Amino acid sequence: MRQVFVFDFDGTLTHSDTLIAFIRHACGRWAMLWGFALSSPWIVLMLMHLYPNYKAKQRLFAHFFGGWEEARFDAACRDFARSHRRLLRQEGLCELGRALTEGAEVAIVSASIDNWVAPFFDEVAGTHRRPVVLGTRVETRDGRLTGRFATPNCYGPEKVRRIREVFPDRDNYHLTAFGDSRGDKEMLDYADQGYYKPFR
């Protein structure tokens, strides 16, 4: 039977969330702090569960990256992955590499933007294969980021929908999933084997 392994990214394969780290890397510390200060009213509402998480995330993303040239954004994503490999959990990377080496189909399923997730896995130790990255995608128009997302935030039930899209015929493979948060619950429940906070 086919073996499919799916990994959450932030907090599962990394030590922390990467959104804030990426904003700081791409925009600088002071611009980040100013942006968060301007965004604080609806961030507070989000923390009080009075404003949807995905809308808050998109507004924050639009503030920092709306209007950026796509090439500039992709270059910042690649540079971020190169300079922040310390964020990765080595035990998680080893498990991912083992799955690839043994011939499993592997995907990273993340609410983070796939542009900065994918470069972390350009080279996985011990294998020439790469995992598929199923992340939140950004919308572009005429070579620039609009600040909006082209797909729903890849969180909760959306993770399962994206897995089904890439790996249909659910009865024909064994699914192993790794996650660490509420946003991974549906994915872990959908799997034959689900591991919660496995690399800590």
Language-model segments: residues:
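Active-site neighborhood of HAD-like aspartate-dependent phosphohydrolases
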Residues: 1-49
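Helix-loop "lid/cap" segments that line or gate small-molecule binding pockets
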Residues: 44-49, 56-65
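Low-complexity, intrinsically disordered basic tails/loops
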Residues: 58, 71-74
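C-terminal cap/substrate-recognition subdomain and adjoining C-terminal extension
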Residues: 1-4, 75-76, 82-200
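N-terminal short leaders/motifs
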Residues: 47-53, 133-136
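Short histidine/acidic/glycine/proline-rich micro-motifs that form metal-
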Residues: 47, 81-82
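N-terminal, charged amphipathic alpha-helical interaction modules
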Residues: 63-64, 73-77
